Amino acid sequence: MMVVREIILALMGFSATKMTVSKINSENRKRIFLMTNNSLLDHKDWGFPVPIFYGPGRIAEIGSICKNLEINNPLIVTDRGSSKLSFIQELRSVLFKAGISSELFFEISPNPVGDEIEAGCIAYRDGNHDAIIGIGGGSGMDGAKAICLTVNNDFDLWAFDYNKPVPQIRSLDLFPKLIMVPTTAGTGAETESTAMVTHAGKGMKFCLDHPQLKISAAILDPSLTLGLPPSLTAWTGVDALTHAIEAYIVPDFHPLCDGAAIEALRLIGKYLVKSVEEPENLEARGGMLVGSCLAGISFLKGLGFVHAISHMVGAEYDTQHGLTNAIVLPVVLRYNLPSLDKKRNHMADALGMSDKTSDGFIGEIEAKLDRLNIPKSLSEIGVPFECASRISEKAMLDSAASTNPVRGGVAQVKELVEQSIKKAR
């Protein structure tokens, strides 16, 4: 109830303002700031996420949740790294005690690829499953969603590309029921239906989605995150931070997402470092899990250049997504924030920052990244300088690029990529 109350209070602080297109000169570049007429007279369509079951130990209730959803034989989907961890056995044990059959599919890599999704579909059909449980980090949950998209119909996986016409799904071919169980606090993948999948032939990540794919339930159990190593806790935590920042500064009128983003920033600002430095602190783990969930809700509104770049770097070099975001974040903030005084002030308040100037905000973010031992450049994680042109061209095709608050073309994004590779901070 406290989280809901805080979101409502956050929403009460926002007002809709009529905004105009303005030209911005910075470092001899002309950049056009994306604006929309944020009027209460506009028509807007807003959705809100799935039923969420939060609390330590809630994984023990998944059997009853399945029964309430009339699920009898789910396929459990996770990534290779999670397949032997204790929470998988705990999940299967709870299901077994509830009289629910299950099988495990764990052939999902850190950056899921199309062939893995097809293999998951085969496993689902061969096992006569009636639902999917996605458990793990963002890769496992994205894999689960991508399998859901294609397993009951004849459409090619890439037909569900967010930028393509929506495939028409017959009622007989509707998507399986889907339960999400995050075991990292970062991606927020449990809150929305999109899946990021790499097309190996093109070396690109694509955002796959369908408006009829709905998550049936999400279980947020912070006890499942207690075993995360500090590095992964930091990387996924900054992923959540990036979601909240990028979503909040998208120039669209969406008070539900904006309220979720601000509350996410408050929780992440309070608990991110603590969850890394005190890994057994259940309160900190819970705060981060809720913050990650709210940040995931917030990016229903859109993201920006950090994610557009990170998606394509990950597709080519198989880098950890949250870590890649963490490195690129300050570079894109320097590009975006000088023209966002009002929103920057709101974010600084939520994060507890005293200096609300653009330099002060970025400086405090960089200090946090230093404390979390985030590398200072993409070159430190194996990304070569010569890829900058190729990555920037691909990034401009990513759906996240279209909602970055400051306009930029391939040339501007190439500069951001080059800075990120050489020296991000």
Write out the residue ranges for each language-model feature:
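An N-terminal, well-structured beta->alpha segment
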Residues: 3-17, 21-105, 424-425
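N-terminal small/polar loop signature for handling phosphorylated ligands or for N-terminal nucleophile
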Residues: 83-156, 273-285
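Glycine/threonine-rich beta-strand-loop-alpha-helix active-site module
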Residues: 115-223
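Glycine-rich phosphate/pyrophosphate-binding beta-alpha loops
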Residues: 186, 293-325, 399-402
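Carboxylate- and glycine-rich phosphate/diphosphate-binding segment that chelates Mg2+/Mn2+
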Residues: 192-301
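Gly/Pro-rich interdomain helix-loop hinge
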Residues: 316-388
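Short, amphipathic C-terminal "tail helix"
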Residues: 387-425
